[in-house]
Amino acid sequence: MARRLMYWQVYLHKTSIGAEFVLVKLLARVKELTHQGKKLPMTTALRFFVENHITKETFDTHALALFAQLDDYDIISGLKEWQHGDDWVLAKLSQMILNRDLLRVRLYRSPVEKEKVQELLREAAEQLQIPEELASYFVFTGEISNTAYRKDEQNILIYTKNNKIIDVTKASDQMNLDALATKVTKYYLCSLK
């Protein structure tokens, strides 16, 4: 139970979701602009992954070495440069992250109606004075889910007094993991404040 609560309160908190998806949109914009031929300032390691389509098959020792060099500095240094760039969308997304002025995130139990998303897209396009296509960087929806306990993937092991390691389900007859094994899905809507 604590695991599920931790995920919802920390990793799947609305602020965390908002920051993560603004960053995802920002990186998509960086990739889009780079593929259009625009030269954006960024570290060598980040540039490699932005300019190339890396798959499981193409992930070689060179890609691994560059991947190992990536850290938050690559992103932060990019954000600090891109916030002053001439692409308005990239600059705005960078400023949002740096200034911690993120999107509003609303969570729902069922998928968000397309009409609601379209209405918010129109409003954002008007407010920001940009085409609806670009407003989709600031208004979007999706789903998140959490399964607190998956015995087949990430079982919890208990070290007993008898020096044995057993699964938590066998360690206690008190543990009803059916409830924890249930996947909980929520739908999010990110939009301007």
Where are these regions (language model features)?
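Histidine-centered, transition-metal-coordinating active-site segments
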Residues: 1-193
